[in-house]
């Protein structure tokens, strides 16, 4: 017989309920409030205050609730469906389908969203490059298979577009399963993403959407849902990993997870920490990030978009994410303003596996030389601004010309942006990327005007465009 209590107090999305003292729900248990119209409001227990009183965070709207309503303890945490039945479906934080394609049957396994991370013995630590088909990422900050990568950027510099392109590329080229968590972002973007994935075909009978699980807790949802939707998606991804698959987990946007935690923390009455964030910021982030890992059975490769408030990388939210990552992709507004997309800053982006023993001598050499040329150009910009190009040595003039071509060559037409740009998307394998930049550095493109390097695939595309213009 489940324990029953009554609502004592409602403050925003936080509900205080009283249970019999010998039947107090455990921390993280789901408690349900029947709403009379056949629906139920699920809340998650966050605090036990003594004398049978608990504080819980609602996963839905608290409109229409009142004191004295009955509360029922389910006796376990929120549990969500896992397995092949979830592919090609869209869920909310509770694991209920929101795509209008009918409910998930009772025969489908459900797992609690709170679980311990894999032990050290189970974890797999081998480093291996994960090809994305995006030149600037593969060359400068290669992803680790089974690693964690974050895409940092302020508002409107293209984080979501990069994430969408990665989903499309990986589904087409590597035919893997993906789990997408929309955390506190725009509902319109989520809707667009679903439609684009339904249109993007892997083959005649399969779309990208058919190989993806989507979980949404968007901007209009209460903070409880935005706080837990990442764990819901992660639980679904862990199932596929434990079945021996290599799975991709996309989280857009991890900052909104922190933001939701901050809202909940304030409503629970905790004293705020630095810059007004919750005192449990590091713990909450660790609980999520430590579960995103590879085991000896399978791997979870995660890509997370991180909104950087006011472009300030020292803000506690992005700074906390940094410590968990294998690679960081930094999107820069000044590059986006020049219409170079993806607007990745190659000098601020890093990867743990950009190592000659992992990516190979040639890749490492080319990447370092590209960085050296770009850094030299950056150093010379002040001189050029004051004295002009004429005052530079011949060697520096050549460096500047090549650096400008490299910057433009890092731009790339994306499949998901095709409808806006009118250019078909290009997937460039790592081998081609390294070869293309090696040719550029060797001087093979010195005679080609820099405009021909903009929005091209590999070096052969640049040559073809230039030769076509000469006819």
From Swiss-Prot:
Belongs to the ATPase alpha/beta chains family. NCBIfam families: atpD. This is ATP synthase subunit beta. It comes from the Bacteria. Its EC number is 7.1.2.2. It catalyses: ATP + H2O + 4 H(+)(in) = ADP + phosphate + 5 H(+)(out). Keywords: ATP synthesis, ATP-binding, Cell membrane, CF(1), Hydrogen ion transport, Ion transport, Membrane, Nucleotide-binding, Translocase, Transport. The gene is atpD. It is an enzyme of class 7 (translocase). Transmembrane segments: none annotated. It is found in: Cell membrane. ATP binds at residues 153-160.
């Amino acid at each position: 017989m489940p324990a029953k209590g009554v609502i004592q107090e409602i403050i925003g999305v936080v509900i205080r309920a009283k249970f019999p003292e010998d039947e107090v729900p455990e921390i993280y248990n789901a408690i349900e409030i029947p709403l009379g119209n056949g629906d139920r409001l699920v809340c998650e227990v966050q605090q036990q205050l003594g004398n049978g009183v608990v504080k819980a965070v609602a996963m839905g709207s608290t409109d229409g609730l009142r004191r004295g309503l009955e509360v029922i303890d389910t006796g376990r945490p929120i549990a969500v469906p896992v397995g092949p039945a979830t592919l090609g479906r869209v869920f909310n934080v509770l694991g209920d389908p929101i795509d209008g394609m009918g409910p998930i049957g009772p025969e489908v396994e459900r797992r609690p969203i709170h679980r311990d991370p894999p032990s050290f013995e189970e974890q797999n630590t081998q480093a291996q490059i994960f090809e994305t088909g995006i030149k600037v990422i593969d060359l400068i900050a290669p992803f680790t298979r089974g690693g964690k990568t974050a895409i940092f950027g302020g508002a409107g510099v293209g984080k979501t577009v990069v994430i969408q392109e990665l989903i499309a590329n990986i589904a087409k080229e590597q035919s893997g399963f993906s789990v997408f968590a929309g955390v506190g972002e725009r509902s319109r973007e989520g809707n667009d993403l679903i439609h684009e994935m339904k249109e993007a075909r892997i083959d005649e009978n399969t779309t990208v959407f058919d190989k993806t699980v989507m979980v949404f807790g968007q901007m209009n949802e209460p903070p409880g849902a935005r706080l837990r939707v990442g764990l819901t998606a992660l639980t679904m991804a862990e199932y596929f990993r434990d079945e021996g698959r290599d799975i991709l987990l996309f989280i857009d946007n991890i900052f909104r997870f922190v933001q939701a935690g901050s809202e909940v923390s304030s409503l629970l009455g905790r004293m705020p920490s630095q810059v007004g964030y919750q005192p449990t910021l590091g713990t909450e982030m660790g609980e999520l990030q430590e579960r995103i890992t590879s085991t000896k059975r399978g791997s979870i490769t995660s890509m997370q978009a991180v909104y950087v408030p006011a472009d300030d990388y020292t803000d506690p939210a992005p700074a906390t994410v940094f410590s968990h990552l294998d690679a960081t992709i930094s999107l820069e507004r000044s590059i986006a303003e020049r219409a170079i997309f993806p607007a990745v800053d190659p000098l601020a982006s890093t990867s743990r596996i950009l190592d000659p023993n992992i990516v190979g001598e040639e890749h490492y050499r080319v990447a370092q030389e590209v960085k050296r040329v770009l850094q030299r150009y950056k150093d010379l910009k002040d001189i050029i601004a004051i004295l002009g190009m004429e005052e530079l040595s011949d060697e520096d003039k050549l460096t500047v010309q090549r650096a400008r071509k490299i910057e433009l060559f890092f731009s790339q037409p994306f499949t998901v942006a095709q409808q806006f740009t009118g250019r078909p998307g290009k997937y460039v394998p790592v081998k081609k990327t390294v070869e293309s930049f090696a040719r550029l550095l060797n001087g093979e493109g010195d005679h080609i005007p820099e405009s021909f390097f903009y929005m091209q695939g590999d070096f052969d595309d640049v040559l073809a465009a230039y030769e076509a213009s000469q006819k």
